[in-house]
Curated annotation (Swiss-Prot):
Gene: coq7
Enzyme class: oxidoreductase
Protein name listed in UniProt: 3-demethoxyubiquinol 3-hydroxylase
InterPro entries associated with the record: COQ7_proteobact, Ferritin-like, Ferritin-like_SF, Ubq_synth_Coq7
EC number: 1.14.99.60
Topology with respect to the bilayer: Peripheral membrane protein
């Protein structure tokens, strides 16, 4: 094996080790570095039923962020242009904030994150890596379409969260701002605008994720 080939192999192995480390951080409790503190708001008194509802919705949001984190990491691994790779890594860093915020809130409500997160992480990482292998344009388009789905879920959750649960609502509101920005950035960078049938298929997959993580 030539020195150049060995260097390429080492570089790829280094990347894989890095991705495994990121996956473990995303899926392990209390190991998520985040640059921004969780948005704070005074929470009113919640009944047991309201706590269960809020916890379930925030668990769904947490799983959504696990999927987003995996999607971005998969795309960063296979992105062809350095600037696209950096864009994916930057977005993944911001998703780390969301992950930590949601996990903290779920625990504060006396519940747990989804037991199926490893499954969703693996699936999302694979989809992201595959999209990156096709082209950066498709990869960016997938980001935009995914973030559109996330924004719809967040808007629905704002409508369902108890009004007095200001602590959860302020987190979701900030996440909504960030996710909308990710979608706009991806399209502005040249992302492919997926046709409606593709988006409908993504909606079906998204509903499976939200329904399972709401309960499990």
């Amino acid at each position: 094996m030539t020195h150049a080939a060995a260097s390429r192999n080492l570089s790829f192995i280094d990347k894989l080790v890095g991705e495994v480390d990121k996956a473990l951080r995303a899926l392990s409790p209390d190991t998520k570095p985040h640059s921004r503190p969780s948005p704070k708001a005074e929470c009113g008194e919640l009944s047991d039923a309201e706590k269960r509802l809020s916890a379930s919705l925030m668990r769904v949001n947490h799983t959504g962020e696990v999927c987003a984190q995996a999607l971005y990491q998969g795309q960063a691994l296979t992105a062809k242009l350095p600037e696209i790779r950096q864009e994916m890594n930057n977005a993944a860093d911001e998703e780390q904030d969301h992950l930590a915020w949601c996990e903290e809130r779920v625990k504060a409500l006396g519940s747990h994150t989804s037991f199926l997160n490893p499954v969703w992480y693996t699936l999302s990482f694979s989809i992201g890596a595959a999209a990156g292998l096709i082209s950066d344009k498709v990869s960016l388009g997938f980001v935009a379409a995914t973030e559109d789905q996330v924004c719809k879920h967040l808007q629905e959750h704002l409508a369902r969260l108890p009004q007095q649960d200001a602590a959860s609502r302020v987190i979701v509101e900030q996440m909504l701002i960030d996710e909308a920005k990710h979608a706009q950035t991806a399209l502005a960078a040249g992302g492919y605008n997926f046709p409606k049938p593709v988006k409908m298929g993504m909606t079906v997959m998204s509903k499976v994720m939200t329904e399972t993580s709401f309960h499990i």
